[in-house]
């Protein structure tokens, strides 16, 4: 009898873990779908200093459904890479890895928020800890970017 009860408990535990993993995957899939498309940078802050709004607006990012991103400056690709999301964390986390250039293969840890029209991203340079808030300060070297979705034509 005890063995049957133990088996039932283990079975219920596995079901609960599977359901939790499915919920995590569903939230991440939803965010991945929201992320897909073109996003215009509307503001950027680096290491505690706000970038010139006109310079920030020269930048945009195109995100594919497959996790590939392309950073563009005045329409020209300047970098591309991959991202992996985890919407189950609070704040939600993103790992960014460039696919080319002198930073190829380096891991940038970040956090994000996203909705239909806007998204916020705060990330740290390689080998630094993941940001814990959507802000920068002198000395932390974080990059905080706010985007607006570009409507398809």
Language-model features, listed with the residues they occupy:
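Hydrophobic alpha-helical segments
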Residues: 16, 54-57
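Contiguous, well-ordered beta-strand patches that form the walls/edges
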Residues: 29-30, 36, 41-53, 64-136
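Short edge beta-strand segments in beta-sheet-rich domains
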Residues: 56-58, 107-109, 139-144
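Amphipathic/hydrophobic helical signal segments and adjacent flexible N-terminal regions
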Residues: 2-50, 146-153
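Secondary-structure transition motifs
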Residues: 127-151
């Amino acid at each position: 009898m005890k063995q049957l009860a133990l088996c039932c408990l283990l079975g219920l535990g596995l079901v609960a873990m599977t359901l939790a993993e499915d919920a995590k995957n569903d939230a991440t899939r939803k965010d991945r779908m929201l992320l897909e498309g073109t996003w215009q940078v509307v503001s950027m802050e680096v290491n505690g200093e706000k970038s010139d709004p006109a310079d920030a607006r020269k930048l945009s990012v195109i995100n594919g459904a497959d996790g590939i991103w392309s950073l563009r400056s005045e329409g020209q690709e300047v970098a591309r890479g991959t991202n992996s999301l985890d919407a189950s964390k609070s704040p939600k986390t993103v790992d960014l890895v460039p696919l080319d250039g002198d930073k190829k293969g380096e891991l940038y840890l970040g956090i994000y928020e996203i909705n239909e029209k806007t998204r916020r991203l705060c990330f740290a340079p390689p080998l630094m800890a993941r940001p814990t808030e959507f802000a920068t300060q002198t000395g932390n070297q974080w990059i905080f970017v706010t985007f607006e979705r570009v409507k398809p034509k």
